[in-house]
């Protein structure tokens, strides 16, 4: 019998890993003792991100909604750590989920100005404060006080500009105006397209 050698350091060897469905995402969040208010925020971001996907799809722009959903549910998985976007992204890269890693690591700043799954989660995160739907301007005005250094303020301004550009792109593609709506999001099943339209001025 021929002996088979497997090296876990071999980049061509990929450990099997389960699909990141909602149940597994929730178990992972609980495993790191993510506070309830952070989980509620993540759920609100997820709902809005999926709404954006549905609206884009209805206009002919197709994205991987399962990837968006999982990435949004997990985007703050390392919230209790310093540099949580980078830390969370590195964690999921090590776990064998490179696409999820990209979404998590970029939710505090996109590498490219491209409308993709990471950009959708990034924008949804910037339109949700805690669980409340807000404007980009309010979200960034309220978070400016956290920026204590010139570098932090510069990064904050770059994120604001990225969020504005993405909002303009989606509004143009979908022929809508994103409204703040004052909507408070709660967990629940996927909304139908008609319900999704409640969150927009069309």
Feature map (PLM): residue ranges:
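Divalent metal-dependent phosphate-bond-processing catalytic cores, especially two-metal-ion Mg2+/Mn2+ enzymes
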Residues: 2-17, 31-61, 74, 110-202
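A short small-residue
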Residues: 23-32
């Amino acid at each position: 019998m021929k002996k088979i050698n497997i090296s876990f350091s071999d980049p061509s060897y990929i450990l099997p890993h389960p699909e990141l469905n909602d149940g597994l995402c929730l178990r992972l969040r609980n495993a790191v003792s993510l506070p309830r208010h952070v989980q509620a925020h993540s759920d609100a971001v997820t709902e809005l991100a999926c709404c954006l996907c549905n609206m884009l799809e209805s206009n002919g722009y197709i994205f991987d909604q399962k990837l968006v959903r999982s990435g949004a549910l997990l985007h703050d998985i390392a919230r209790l750590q310093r540099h949580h976007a980078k830390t969370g992204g590195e964690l999921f890269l090590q776990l064998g989920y490179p696409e999820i890693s990209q979404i998590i690591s970029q939710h505090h700043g996109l590498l490219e100005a491209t409308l993709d799954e990471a950009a959708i989660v990034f924008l949804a995160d910037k339109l949700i404060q805690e669980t409340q739907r807000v404007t980009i301007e309010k979200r960034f005005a309220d978070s400016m006080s956290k920026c204590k250094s010139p570098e932090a303020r510069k990064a904050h301004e770059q994120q604001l500009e990225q969020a504005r550009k993405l909002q303009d792109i989606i509004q143009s593609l979908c022929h809508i105006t994103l409204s703040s709506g004052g909507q408070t999001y709660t967990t629940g099943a996927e909304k139908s397209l008609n319900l999704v339209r409640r969150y927009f001025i069309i």
